[in-house]
From Swiss-Prot:
The lineage of its organism: Bacteria, Pseudomonadati, Pseudomonadota, Alphaproteobacteria, Rickettsiales. The keyword Lyase does not apply. GO terms for molecular function: CDP-diacylglycerol-glycerol-3-phosphate 3-phosphatidyltransferase activity. It is an enzyme of class 2 (transferase). It is found in: Cell membrane. It catalyses: a CDP-1,2-diacyl-sn-glycerol + sn-glycerol 3-phosphate = a 1,2-diacyl-sn-glycero-3-phospho-(1'-sn-glycero-3'-phosphate) + CMP + H(+). Belongs to the CDP-alcohol phosphatidyltransferase class-I family. The keyword Lipid metabolism applies. Pathway: Phospholipid metabolism; phosphatidylglycerol biosynthesis; phosphatidylglycerol from CDP-diacylglycerol: step 1/2. The gene is pgsA. Keywords: Cell membrane, Lipid biosynthesis, Lipid metabolism, Membrane, Phospholipid biosynthesis, Phospholipid metabolism, Transferase, Transmembrane, Transmembrane helix. The chain crosses the membrane at residues 8-28, 35-55, 64-84, 148-168. Its EC number is 2.7.8.5. This is CDP-diacylglycerol--glycerol-3-phosphate 3-phosphatidyltransferase. Disulfide bonds: none annotated.
Amino acid sequence: MRIDKNLPNYLTIARIMVIPVIILAFYINNSLARKLGALLFVLASITDFFDGYIARKYNLVTSFGKMFDPIADKLLIGCVIIMLLKKDNVDEIPCLLILAREFLVSGLREFLALVKVSVPVSRLAKVKTFLQMFALSILILGSKGSGIIYLDIVGEIILWIAAFLTIITGYSYFKACKKYF
């Protein structure tokens, strides 16, 4: 099977470009718009898996992808967290833990790249990302979009679990940098 050599990069770019549409759908604030926003977020989240999978499987890894895939993830997650904090009654603590870790780890990854140290993404970090995206999907839809009364609580519980894993997985980056402090 022939794959366009830029397909993984197109998926990464699409993930970034859908962010304003997700936010707009959320702010329209009716059930259908919430469902659309949640669906778009889920689709954008799925591209995170496929861009990396396709790039590795078909040897299409690029410098652009290495740089922008994590940026796209952080933009998607960060924008949705900020949106939820501003508009809905979402607990600030797990949101701030996730945002702080993502910014710190981004900086540490840049530093480690400068000193030629690679820290591979662990399986636990992939679980963390999945749980973040799953929780945020639920919270975008929320009780307002689904009619399911306790859906927000389920989303918050999963978000707390994701925040806990966020701290644990961030430790590997700090550990890799320790000898440079």
